[in-house]
Swiss-Prot record:
The keyword ATP-binding does not apply. Heterodimer of HisH and HisF. Its EC number is 4.3.2.10. It is found in: Cytoplasm. Belongs to the HisA/HisF family. It comes from Thermotoga maritima (strain ATCC 43589 / DSM 3109 / JCM 10099 / NBRC 100826 / MSB8). One of its GO terms (molecular function) is imidazoleglycerol-phosphate synthase activity. It holds the Pfam family His_biosynth. Keywords: Amino-acid biosynthesis, Cytoplasm, Histidine biosynthesis, Lyase. One of its GO terms (cellular component) is cytoplasm. InterPro entries: Aldolase_TIM, His_biosynth, HisF, IGPS_HisA/HisF, RibuloseP-bd_barrel. This is Imidazole glycerol phosphate synthase subunit HisF. It catalyses: 5-[(5-phospho-1-deoxy-D-ribulos-1-ylimino)methylamino]-1-(5-phospho-beta-D-ribosyl)imidazole-4-carboxamide + L-glutamine = D-erythro-1-(imidazol-4-yl)glycerol 3-phosphate + 5-amino-1-(5-phospho-beta-D-ribosyl)imidazole-4-carboxamide + L-glutamate + H(+). Pathway: Amino-acid biosynthesis; L-histidine biosynthesis; L-histidine from 5-phospho-alpha-D-ribose 1-diphosphate: step 5/9.
Length: 253
């Protein structure tokens, strides 16, 4: 059985990590390379860099950053945010990103999923889906959760797999930032619809929440602030999960 993965998410703006971190032993906690290296050393299985820089002219900064990260880090890393076309996705992968995460662009141009998958393999394409409840149905939202697409979550999950996605990054807008636990109802809803790995996102606040996500059917759990502010220690989290019967990677811890 494949080990369940713990993923840290870093928001990057103009080549710097924002939203703050609380690591005293880092010279510069705003440096994505240093922070990424640190995370890889303490047992995080994968990293997601989310480029929240709005402007296209800053893309060069992200490309240079990806190159530096690829040189320094030996765990898989995904880059997302602002990827609207094949050229951008392609450049990021060629510079060293293991995977790219696409969200709004995938909804607006689903053939982009297929194009990236056919060129670089399905494992390089993560489709990020932001969903929330509307009148009792899970609906897909784009533009950072602002626009209701009118697409049912169940339909979109099936389509992204057909189109060649390798993974689904499932964020519950209702839970994001609440620290009240992952949306296990949403995870359970999506699980039977796809054979793709599901990364649960939104709501991590304590170790039990990770266990709940895995028991609900998630293959990986992503979190940000609980790691950045050391509210959860990665080693302790993995030991806790193992004790509760979850297969996690402990080598190097």
């Amino acid at each position: 059985m494949l080990a369940k993965r713990i993923i840290a998410c870093l928001d990057v703006k103009d080549g710097r990590v924002v939203k703050g971190t609380n690591f005293e032993n880092l010279r510069d906690s705003g440096d994505p390379v240093e922070l990424g290296k640190f995370y890889s050393e303490i047992g995080i299985d994968e990293l997601v860099f989310l480029d929240i820089t709005a402007s296209v002219e800053k893309r060069k900064t992200m490309l240079e950053l990806v190159e530096k990260v690829a040189e320094q880090i030996d765990i898989p890393f995904t880059v997302g945010g602002g990827i609207h076309d094949f050229e951008t996705a392609s450049e990021l992968i060629l510079r060293g990103a293991d995977k790219v995460s696409i969200n709004t662009a995938a909804v607006e141009n689903p053939s982009l999923i297929t194009q990236i998958a056919q060129t670089f393999g399905s494992q390089a394409v993560v489709v990020a889906i932001d969903a929330k409840r509307v009148d009792g149905e899970f609906m897909v939202f784009t533009y950072s959760g602002k626009k209701n697409t009118g697409i049912l979550l169940r339909d979109w999950v099936v389509e992204v797999e057909k189109r060649g996605a390798g993974e689904i990054l499932l964020t519950s807008i209702d839970r994001d930032g609440t620290k009240s636990g992952y949306d296990t109802e949403m995870i359970r809803f999506v699980r039977p619809l796809t054979t793709l790995p599901i990364i649960a996102s939104g709501g991590a606040g304590k170790m039990e929440h990770f266990l709940e996500a895995f028991l609900a059917g998630a293959d990986a759990a992503l979190a940000a602030s609980v790691f950045h502010f050391r509210e959860i220690d990665v080693r302790e989290l993995k030991e806790y999960l193992k004790k509760h019967g979850v297969n996690v990677r402990l080598e190097g811890l």
